[in-house]
Amino acid sequence: MKSSTQTILEHTAIPRHIAVIMDGNGRWAKKRFLPRIMGHKRGLDALENMVKHCAKLGVQYLTVFAFSTENWRRPEDEVSFLMGLFLQALQKQVRRLHENNMRLKILGSRERFNRQILQGIEEAEALTANNTGLTLSIAADYGGRWDILQAANKLIAEGVSEITEDTLAKHLMLGDAPEPDLFIRTGGETRISNFLLWQMAYAELYFTDILWPDFDETALDAAVASFQKRERRFGRTSEQLPIGQQRN
């Protein structure tokens, strides 16, 4: 059986694909006696800085968890603000991405988004579709279980007689991208919260107490430095790895 793990980069100075849960916006605001929405605003600034630094480092794919299927349970005013911030980012930031030859993709179900947001998504993806630089994928109304289920349902609808790792992987939201090499979660929590459950099977996990609005270039460099020290064996022994990939 052909395994999807062949898309993972086994050893490199810089991870080809970084996935991030941007956690801690609300706590960042609370510590400063500010409304939670101010934390989300600063979180957007942190994302802009991370995109720039990832491109500078040579990262090819950056996938961030912006809004999960479970986040609809948050207070109505916060959800409304997040949707407005999402639309604002689509309208204002996509031009900057396009000017820097970056591609934008939105992952997740779009059934609950209003017409204005749907139009913003379509226009942003179309504008940047042919760019060849860093690909920024934003997971919004996304869940890892939902992703696997929708991929399986697509295959059933196509009448596929046998589902393999390879065929399923190609129907996932990140089906055209290599699997993440490095997963970062800020804010002190040590779980993956239903994010990219299939795709992160072999990702290196990095957890930090830094709240997302404070996650800067230095913090990203520290995460990458940790990644560079890892020995990625994928079931093999250390002795089976090429000399340059063995950990001292």
From Swiss-Prot:
Protein keywords: Magnesium, Metal-binding, Transferase
Cofactor names: Mg(2+)
Cofactor descriptive note: Binds 2 magnesium ions per subunit.
Sequence intervals crossing the membrane: none
EC numbers on record: 2.5.1.-
Binding site for substrate: 24-28, 36, 40, 68-70, 72, 74, 185, 191-193
One Pfam family linked to the record: Prenyltransf
GO (cellular component) term, any one: cytosol
GO biological process: polyprenol biosynthetic process
Active site: 23, 71
Binding-site list for Mg(2+): 23, 204
Keyword Magnesium listed: yes
GO MF annotation terms: ditrans,polycis-undecaprenyl-diphosphate synthase [(2E,6E)-farnesyl-diphosphate specific] activity; magnesium ion binding
HAMAP family listed in its UniProt record: ISPT (MF_01139)
Subunit and partners: Homodimer.
NCBIfam families according to UniProt: PRK14830.1, uppS
Family (UniProt): Belongs to the UPP synthase family.
Function statement: Catalyzes the condensation of isopentenyl diphosphate (IPP) with allylic pyrophosphates generating different type of terpenoids.
Protein name: Isoprenyl transferase
Organism: Neisseria gonorrhoeae (strain ATCC 700825 / FA 1090)
Gene: uppS
